[in-house]
Amino acid sequence: MSRRRSLTFTRRATLRLGAFGAAGAALAATGLSGARAQAEAPGAAFGPARHGLSVFGDLQLPADFSHFPYVNPDAPKGGAMRLVPPQWGYNQNPQTFNTFNTFILAGDAAPMMETCFDTLMVRQLEEPDAVYGLVAESVSVSDDEKVFAFHLRPEARFHDGAPLTAEDVAFSLETLRTKGHPTLRQILSWIDSVTVEDPETVVVAMKAAASNRLPPTVASMPILSKAYYETHDFQRSSLDVPLSSGPYTVGRYETGRFVEYQRVADWWGKDLPVSRGHANFDVVRVEFFRDRQIAFQALTKGTLNFREEFTSKTWATEYNFPAVEDGRVVKAEFPDNLPAGAQGWFINLRREKFADPRTRQALGLAFDFQWTNTNLFYGAYERTSSYFENSEMKAEGMPSAAELALLEPLRGQVSETVFGEAWTPPVSSGSGTDRDLLRRANDLLLEAGWTRDGRRLVDAQGRPFTIEFLDNSPAFERVVQPYARNLERL
């Protein structure tokens, strides 16, 4: 087995290579080899090279897997996808754009720019805790699982043909950690050090308190070209197309109107197991609209050929245009089997009036989800009862023996309800003013120390109980108003 696949540092040598301060700088300056370090500091070696990383256990796919199980490895290439992106991150804006630098705070970047960049490893969507090698052919992990040596594929290339090396990976992590978008800086602040061992090996050491979920996240960070940013300011918001190495690159665009991502036909990684069946469209065109309804009209006119719908009223009442009727547009629901997000109001616990949990429970009882779902959401919603909805981590029923083993040391420090049935939200009569639930809410408020002063609910100092709602869209006013009327009844 080649050295690139089975790096065998001692723990002491590895920590020295990755330490902050003069010791780490001296090692980098002298180019102390792994062999010399190992000879000077005998000790535990790295484990065998792995083809991926998993947070909770073994990898689902073997080292010789041919493709991810949910893709068609023989999917035809070609065509164009035209859409409004259903999700975005960093400084991306779905309504307009003025920069292609998506990894900083400044500017409004075009969504989907990340498709232009390769990463060390990529996620396998049927394993939410696992990543498999893309630029990194394999990874070796220290015994304490805090130091990771990524072994790069020698064939990895940027779009200009230049090799993608460990220097680029180290530069990327350091740059994103110190100059990147605040989200990236926060994540990468848990890295202790990044060290280039040789052109095809980069060693990343995590801080002792870092979560075991960090390594797959670090392995999913975009890889930048060090050479490119030696002549370009990383922190500058610009429409210069950055040099990258991924399956797509920026093609035609009009600022604020559209951007086309062009498939790179000779992308170096197109035949890897993690890539087969992906990046099938020749062109992915992102369209920009400042109004949701205008974006929907673009679908009806054929400007878009894909749309993910987030508005239940539109889904229930407006997908009846001719292209749907004659089958040119297919309306379908797909179970995604992924952890669901949460939508709701989050109570500001820094406000003293919300400190008592009985007060918060009362607020929950006053919201009639069943009425709201029937009358406002067209029956399309299901009530969220966990931050881990639609995942194996959602609490259901009584704690299992394994869960109790984790919980018992905390008995007396957490609520006893933790040891009973998992919480489920109240179910109303659907009338909009369920008297039983409102009566229970009133009782809880009185138990929490609130009293009646005529029609007002006041605290011990006579201050009225007021609530301010902050929403990110005026569309939710129709949801707030019935809820507010129920709160006024209390």
Please place each PLM-identified region on the residue numbering.
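Extracellular/periplasmic solute-recognition and catalytic clefts
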Residues: 193-196, 251-262, 287-351, 358-362, ...
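Surface-exposed binding/hinge segments that line
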Residues: 151, 185-230, 245-254, 397-413
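Gly/Pro-rich hinge or "lid" segments in bacterial periplasmic/extracellular proteins
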Residues: 106-127, 174, 218-285, 290-297, ...
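Short, well-ordered beta-strand elements
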Residues: 79-87, 148-149, 246-248, 259-260, ...
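N-terminal lobe/hinge region of extracytoplasmic solute-binding protein
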Residues: 44-143, 174, 243
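Aromatic- and charge-enriched surface segment that lines or borders ligand/interaction sites
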Residues: 71, 75, 96, 103-108, ...
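Append "and occasionally in soluble cytosolic enzymes with long acidic Gly/Pro-rich linkers
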Residues: 355-485, 489
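N-terminal secretory signal peptides
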Residues: 1-13, 17-30
